[in-house]
From Swiss-Prot:
Location relative to the cell: Cytoplasm
Family: Belongs to the gamma-glutamyl phosphate reductase family.
EC number: 1.2.1.41
Lineage: Bacteria, Thermotogati, Deinococcota, Deinococci, Thermales
Protein name: Gamma-glutamyl phosphate reductase
Key word Lipid biosynthesis present: no
Its biological purpose: Catalyzes the NADPH-dependent reduction of L-glutamate 5-phosphate into L-glutamate 5-semialdehyde and phosphate. The product spontaneously undergoes cyclization to form 1-pyrroline-5-carboxylate.
Cellular component annotations (GO), alphabetically ordered: cytoplasm
Enzyme class: oxidoreductase
GO term, biological process aspect, one: L-proline biosynthetic process
Reactions catalysed according to its record: L-glutamate 5-semialdehyde + phosphate + NADP(+) = L-glutamyl 5-phosphate + NADPH + H(+)
Domain of life of the source: Bacteria
UniProt keyword terms in alphabetical order: Amino-acid biosynthesis, Cytoplasm, NADP, Oxidoreductase, Proline biosynthesis
Length: 417
């Protein structure tokens, strides 16, 4: 594929900006972050107006309630973004840190210095708040970012990137460090995937189709943020009331997010007690239950189809299965899980430890809601996504995960024998 001159020019400008940003002082970067936060507040009405254009077009196009929820900018979203920017500004700057310094027998001091990755291509769907979060993290880590957002959020993203570029300039940093690809045409995704000489990493964040397209086409390393087909296993030894509260929070607190609960696996010995309690709580919350044959025999639920076990709903729908043992639960998760978030409710220590060891996911929890798979909740500050790839980063990607290390050696005239 031939890259369009316009997109290539944007990538070249990002490359030049990345070189400048890699040597920027922590003070300059933090000044820019705080300026972005101030502009989010000062330009709130203009941002709401741009977002209304996107919401009206999305509603006319028949977008789902879950997608509309992710698209919406309101006072709480902007307040959370401002808080996140302030927290990122307060975090230690990892760039230039030297880790693992050791003195070799010949007196040579060897360590690893943390450095920016360079230029990040961020391909994502209808979440304008991700525009700010991703840009802030890349800025703090000394990276330039080339954003390709979804067409649903075009007006919102343009407004957000415009104010962030103004903040960069005010801080004496290149405005090209944060750029929005000037088209929502799908061909731009393929073009970005082929910019191996200009982009250092691509992070796709969205549905299965987008992730698979980028992984198939990219000539650049990819850190995938895939869908969250997240399970809760309710072990026979658990407190059923506690398990119901965890399931309820996981499903209903914000069902449109990738760390929400989609499936519940219930040990057969506790199912007769737990499932009626679960059904009552979910019915009150407006959640549609689907289940296997054993579940449907115990509570009112729609019979689950084979597709249900491999579907991320991002909606008030929950699929339930009764299993015979911990082993069966582990096998089910290995088959249908998406390596995102998995949880167990149990009072059995050995079962908890086995679940932690054997489940392959970016976050595995014991007696806690899957909604905790989030950069802020895990102490990272904001996140650019939750990596379900194992190389370089696994789990929420904060500032440190957007850097790499190079070896450095400090000598006093040593030569090799």
């Amino acid at each position: 594929m031939v890259t369009s001159p316009e997109l290539k020019a944007y990538a070249q400008a990002a490359r030049a900006a990345a070189r400048a940003l890699s040597t920027a002082s922590p003070r300059a970067k933090n000044t820019a972050l705080l300026a972005i936060a101030a502009k989010l507040e000062a330009q709130q009405e203009a941002l709401f107006a741009a977002n209304r254009e996107d919401l009206e077009a999305a509603q006319a196009a028949g977008l789902s309630k879950a997608k509309l929820d992710r698209l919406r900018l309101d006072e709480k979203v902007l307040r959370d973004l401002r808080t996140g920017l302030q927290q990122v500004a307060e975090m230690p700057d990892p760039v230039g840190e030297i880790e693992g310094l050791q003195i070799r027998p010949n007196g040579l001091q060897v360590g690893r210095m943390r450095v920016p990755l360079g230029v990040i291509g961020f391909i994502y769907e209808s979440r304008p708040n991700a525009t700010v979060e991703a840009s802030a993290l890349c800025l703090k880590a000394g990276n330039a970012i080339l954003l390709r957002g979804g067409k649903e959020a075009w007006h919102s993203n343009r407004a957000l990137v415009g104010l962030m570029q103004a903040a960069l300039q005010e801080a004496g940093l290149p405005r090209e460090a944060i750029q929005l690809v000037p088209t929502t045409d799908r061909s731009a995704i393929l073009e970005m995937c082929h910019l191996a000489d200009l982009l250092d990493l691509i992070i796709p964040r969205g549905g299965r189709g987008l992730i698979e397209l980028v992984q198939r086409e990219a000539r650049i390393p990819v850190l995938a943020h895939t869908e969250g087909i997240n399970h809760l296993f309710v072990d026979e030894s658990t407190d059923p009331g506690c398990a119901v509260q965890i399931a309820l929070n996981g499903k209903t607190q914000r069902p449109s997010t990738c760390n929400s609960l989609e499936k519940v696996l219930v040990h057969q010995r506790i199912a007769p007690v737990f499932l009626p309690m679960l059904a009552q709580a979910m019915q009150k919350a407006g959640v549609e239950l689907r289940g296997d044959e054993a579940t449907c025999a115990l509570i009112p639920a729609r019979p689950a189809t084979p597709e249900d076990w491999q579907t991320e709903y991002l909606d008030l729908i929950l699929t339930v299965k009764v299993v015979n043992s911990l082993e069966e639960a582990l096998e089910h998760i290995a088959r249908y899980g998406s390596h995102h978030t998995e949880a167990i409710c149990t009072n059995h220590h050995a079962h908890a430890m086995r679940f932690l060891r054997e489940v392959d996911a970016s976050l595995v929890l014991v007696n806690a809601s899957p909604r905790f798979n989030d950069g802020f909740q895990l102490g990272l500050g904001a996140e650019i996504g939750i990596s379900t790839s194992k190389l370089h980063a696994y789990g929420p990607m904060g500032v440190k995960e957007l850097t790499t290390t190079k070896f450095v050696a400090l000598g006093s005239g040593q030569v090799r024998d």
